[in-house]
A protein has these predicted regions:
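Intrinsically disordered, low-complexity segments enriched in small/polar residues
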Residues: 11-13, 38, 92, 104, ...
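Short, well-ordered beta-strand segments in beta-rich or mixed alpha/beta enzyme
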Residues: 2-9, 39-70
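Acidic/histidine-enriched, glycine/proline-rich intrinsically disordered or flexible terminal extensions
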Residues: 94-118
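An amphipathic, aromatic/His-enriched active-site/gating alpha helix that lines ligand/cofactor pockets
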Residues: 23-40, 58-96, 118
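Solvent-exposed, flexible loop/coil residues
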Residues: 42, 47, 90, 100-103
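Serine/proline-rich low-complexity intrinsically disordered segments, especially terminal tails, linkers
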Residues: 34, 43-44, 112-115
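Short, surface-exposed ligand-recognition loops at beta-strand->loop->(often short) alpha-helix junctions
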Residues: 9-22
Length: 118
């Protein structure tokens, strides 16, 4: 299992719209759910900086994640254009081997089934 980690610095005042795009019910997450390898994601906002976010996506394997990116490139490009107006800076933190997976519950967790677990 892999964890793909992204960091975003969102433009002041754009947080709510950014959260709609990347949150557990957001368009980005809905697109990821189309892949059988997508296990879920955790979406986090920094306590010390309301414009800094992390997105951690969990995928079954790298090869299927890469196939997802290729298969949905057109939709991903459109979502990235939306994101560009909301984000000042984005950093691909990296792809990690997931040694321990969250309990898959809570307000930030989104899973493949399409429902958020509380």
């Amino acid at each position: 299992m892999i964890a793909v980690v992204w960091q975003f610095d969102v433009r002041p005042g754009a947080g709510a719209e950014f959260e709609k795009l990347y949150g557990s019910d957001g368009t980005w997450t809905e697109l990821s759910r189309r892949s059988r390898s997508f296990l879920g994601s955790s979406f986090l906002r920094d306590i010390g900086s309301e414009t800094r976010y992390l997105l951690v996506e969990y995928w079954g394997e790298m090869m299927v994640y890469e196939k997802h990116l290729a298969d949905f490139q057109k939709q991903i490009d459109a979502l990235e254009q939306q994101r560009a107006s909301l984000v000042e800076r984005m950093e691909a933190v990296g792809v990690f081997t997931a040694l321990d997976v969250p309990a898959r519950a809570g307000p930030t967790w989104s899973q493949r089934s399409g429902r958020r677990v509380e």
